[in-house]
Curated annotation (Swiss-Prot):
This is Holliday junction branch migration complex subunit RuvB. One of its GO terms (biological process) is DNA recombination. Its EC number is 3.6.4.-. It comes from Sinorhizobium medicae (strain WSM419). It is found in: Cytoplasm.
Amino acid sequence: MSEAARLIAPEKRGEDVDATLRPQTLDEFTGQAEARANLKIFIEAARNRGEALDHVLFVGPPGLGKTTLAQIMAKELGVNFRSTSGPVIAKAGDLAALLTNLEERDVLFIDEIHRLNPAVEEILYPAMEDFQLDLIIGEGPSARSVKIDLAKFTLVAATTRLGLLTTPLRDRFGIPVRLNFYTVEELELIVRRGARLMGLGMTDEGAREIARRARGTPRIAGRLLRRVRDFAEVARAEAVTRQIADEALTRLLVDSMGLDQLDRRYLTMIAQNFGGGPVGIETIAAGLSEPRDAIEDIIEPYLIQQGFIQRTPRGRVLTANAWKHLGLNPPKDVEASQFRLTLEDD
């Protein structure tokens, strides 16, 4: 199963972009309480001073609301919002066109900034620090450097892989914000709100069942909600109950912990082929026929958060929780092995 085909893949799809379901203010935004509280202060301070907000870097897994928060920030600052992504900005001229069209205090959002072309990144440094573009016009002996003044703007960037950002780029963000997976209670509120805006009846137990399987990710919660709605409407149910949600998601192969076929293949392969590990990431990628990046960025973060695997210097290792979830008997020394590997990791 490819990552794009997964119902619970956290990457954005066309169906996920529903403006009516998106919160419009920080007060409407559910979850990330600490980040929201700090952003409120920074936004109010910048607005009171009439200055551009310091550059902001959002770090965290896909689907946690980085784009939505950037849009809300622009709205609460009362400025324009421009959006792009790292891979789209192929050359310096593309970035120059974006930056020269910004007005004073505007917000420019760059998603996946870790995938920015290094040559483009060099142009971004003086733009962020001095609000100037340093461009080279011409070639060879006739080449000359031209400085272009820019409006004082705010760059809001998002990355799922902080380690891939260069130190000079990372250090130019005055406001780093780490986003974490959501609790079941927070996702339950998001599911209820979505159901209300859809005009869909929803019991508390139904909302909780969807939230439990949403992998701590609002984007996945919204996608599961839309699929459960389809089952409920065809069944002519007045409201989504726990039974309807459970039947729908079970038929969609999303289990009680939010794991799908690919997650279970990952865990089962380590259990049955490698005795629970340790096993290297390249071996896992080859066994699953999935790119290493997809495994590290998409599959593993949730499994680690749920306590199903450990990353150690010698490779990935299944925990007792994983063996129990798979319904398999772990090796007798699994707990002792995990303790030893943890000590080695430290």
